[in-house]
Swiss-Prot record:
InterPro entries: KH_dom-like_a/b, KH_dom_type_2, KH_sf_prok-type, Ribosomal_S3_C_sf, Ribosomal_uS3_bac-typ, Ribosomal_uS3_C, Ribosomal_uS3_CS. It comes from the Eukaryota. Part of the 30S ribosomal subunit. This is Small ribosomal subunit protein uS3c. It comes from Staurastrum punctulatum (Green alga). One of its GO terms (cellular component) is cytosolic small ribosomal subunit. Belongs to the universal ribosomal protein uS3 family. PROSITE patterns: KH_TYPE_2, RIBOSOMAL_S3. It holds the Pfam family Ribosomal_S3_C. GO terms for biological process: translation. Disulfide bonds: none annotated. Residues 47-119 form the KH type-2 domain. One of its GO terms (molecular function) is rRNA binding. Keywords: Chloroplast, Plastid, Ribonucleoprotein, Ribosomal protein, RNA-binding, rRNA-binding.
Amino acid sequence: MGQKIHPLGFRLGVTQSHLSNWCVQPSQYSELLQEDEKLRGCIKEYVRKYVRTAENYGGIDRIEIQRKTSAIKVEIHTGFPKLFVEKLGPRLKEIRREMQNTLQKSKHLKFIISLAEVEKPYAKATILAEYIAVQVERRVAFRKTIKKAIQLAKEQGNVKGIKIQIAGRLNGAEIARSEWAREGRVPLQTLRAQIDYCHYPAHTIYGVLGIRVWIFQEK
C-alpha cells in the first residue's frame, strides 16, 4: 500500500505555520506541548456544549497559542465570531478558571483569550468538515451533503480544487466502505501548493464516520 504523509505536517515552514509559538528548554517542551493540547481540548469542549447545536456548529478553524513570561495568549480563529460572543461571552470567567485548573505548570499565568474572524469560512477544511459532520449526524444523505459542501467551498471564490471523503457504515450498511468526490485540482505532491486538510469524526447511531477534506486554494 502507498504511505500517505499528512498534508499539513509536510508543508510546515513552507505554506503552513505552527499553532503553538513559544521557546522553552528542551526538558520542558513535551510538558508544555501537552498543556497546549489540553487548552485546545478545553475550548472545544465548551464549544461542543454551549455553541454547537443541530442548527449551529462551532466553526473553529484553528486555535493558536503564544506563551510569554507572564501570560498565555489564546487566539481562536472562527468563521462565526458573533455566535461565539453570544454563547460563550457570559462564560468567559468560567472558561479561564477551567483552563487554569487544567494546567499544572502554568496555573499562575494570566490568560488572554481573543477571537479572530475567518473571512471565508467555507474555504477552510476544518469548518467545512464540521459542517459535513453536523449534517450527517442529522441523518441528511451523505451524497447530498458532499455536493452541498463542494458548492459552499466553490462559492468562496479562492478555492481551485476540493476533495471530500467519508468512510464508515454509510446509510447504516452492514459493511463499512468509503465514498469520495473531487472537483478541480488537489496537487498533494506540490510543496508550494496551498493545501488545507482536516480529518473529523461524525458520531451516528450506526457508529463513527471519518470525514476527510482537502482544499486547494489560491495563494
